[in-house]
A protein has these predicted regions:
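Compositionally biased intrinsically disordered regions enriched in Thr/Gly
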Residues: 4-233
């Protein structure tokens, strides 16, 4: 789980100082392009190498700036203000899971070392409504009770963290879903803004495992038995 300080939400990072742009458009659609940006910072306390996307060529420049600020504060700010005095080393990259004219869904993965301790694997997501220029929460697109009913082994594929050889019965999967709702990948993320991703027809869930239980993640993705239409609002 990543703990977020208030200062990160206020954007106290000079974006222009440490960012290099890779002038290679990826995932282009008719209304915008996605550019790969890199944030690199090396100081006595911090080593950060973070790749993240930015949007270009939107007709609404003000909205484009708002979206890019959201992306930057999530991609970089979560690490920067949390660990600024703790001898942080972090390396993170991203995958564009889905993008079209209306939405973009990004999954971030990387490793963080604090004060020369063992590296921790980090995983979180960011989903943005490109029409509104806002972050999408789980309940904006998914009916939680429908998802609860469909949250069964046959409907999900294990991407990471859960041994498929361990038999979880129906009640076990129910407990795992309750765990997903209770524990958050990002501290205080009651709306589950940062622990899911989606495509046209699939959803991925990132379940945070508490530090005292190993501090890792379980990542599940819906199988062909479960479509987004089955769990949409």
């Amino acid at each position: 789980m990543i703990i977020v300080s208030k200062s990160c939400k206020n954007g106290n990072i000079n974006r222009g100082t440490y960012i290099s742009k890779e002038e290679q458009a990826i995932n282009s659609v008719s209304k915008y392009r996605i550019i790969k940006d890199k944030f690199i910072l090396n100081t006595t306390n911090m080593e950060m190498h973070i790749e993240y996307p930015s949007i270009s060529d939107m007709s609404d420049i003000e909205k484009q700036e708002r979206i890019n600020k959201l992306i930057f504060l999530t991609s970089v700010g979560l690490y920067y203000n949390t660990y600024v005095h703790n001898k942080l080393k972090t390396s993170s990259n991203y995958t564009i899971v889905h993008n079209d004219d209306k939405y973009i869904s990004v999954k971030y993965e990387g490793f963080t070392t604090v004060e020369a301790r063992r590296p921790n694997y980090d995983c979180f997501c960011l989903n943005i409504d490109l029409i509104k220029g806002e972050v999408i929460g789980l309940e904006d697109v998914i009916d939680i009770e429908k998802l609860r009913v469909k949250f069964k082994k046959d409907n999900f594929t294990v991407v990471k963290g859960l041994d498929e050889n361990i038999p979880l019965d129906e009640s076990g999967w129910g407990e795992l879903f309750d765990h997903y709702l209770e524990y958050h990948v990002i501290s205080g993320d009651e709306l589950h803004n940062y622990d899911f991703y989606f495509t046209d027809n699939k959803i991925g869930l990132i379940i945070s495992v508490p530090v005292d239980a190993g501090g890792s993640y379980i990542i599940l993705e819906s199988s062909d038995n479960l479509s987004m239409d089955d769990i949409k609002k």
